[in-house]
Amino acid sequence: MSIVIGADAAGLRLKEVVKDFLEKENFHLVDVTAEGQDFVDVTLAVAAEVNKEEQNLGIVIDAYGAGPFIVATKIKGMVAAEVSDERSAYMTRSHNNSRMITMGAQLVGDELAKNIAKGFVNGKYDGGRHQIRVDMLNKMG
């Protein structure tokens, strides 16, 4: 499993904080950030890498998280969530089988961002009654 991470200019500093944290937790990271990229391009790059392997997960950071979330929801088969708290990050994995989260550097601080990332990457999909909803999401687009 790889954690694919990317950020636009507004999210660069926080991306480095999250990246360093996850590397210290022994996760394999793929950073697709390229200088001058818009959040649209960053999100598409993260999604492309996430979709290479079923186990891969993605994190996109910009100013507010909303833009990358909108982009991610346009990608067929991508279940994503905009999160700004640890519980939502964990629950979107366990109930929605989300493969990507977005967050805003102007909304969350360093410690919260680390906890959000930790909750997301450590979350496990519960399946069961949630699979009906996930199947519905995967048919969309």
From Swiss-Prot:
Top-level taxonomic group: Bacteria
Similarity section: Belongs to the LacAB/RpiB family.
Protein name: Galactose-6-phosphate isomerase subunit LacA
Pathway info: Carbohydrate metabolism; D-galactose 6-phosphate degradation; D-tagatose 6-phosphate from D-galactose 6-phosphate: step 1/1
Any GO molecular function: galactose-6-phosphate isomerase activity
UniProt record, GO biological process: D-allose catabolic process; galactose catabolic process; lactose catabolic process via tagatose-6-phosphate; pentose-phosphate shunt, non-oxidative branch
Signal sequence annotation: none
Pfam families, per the entry: LacAB_rpiB (PF02502)
Gene3D superfamilies associated with the record: Sugar-phosphate isomerase, RpiB/LacA/LacB (3.40.1400.10)
Subunit relationships: Heteromultimeric protein consisting of LacA and LacB.
The species this protein was found in: Streptococcus pneumoniae (strain Taiwan19F-14)
Keyword tags: Isomerase, Lactose metabolism
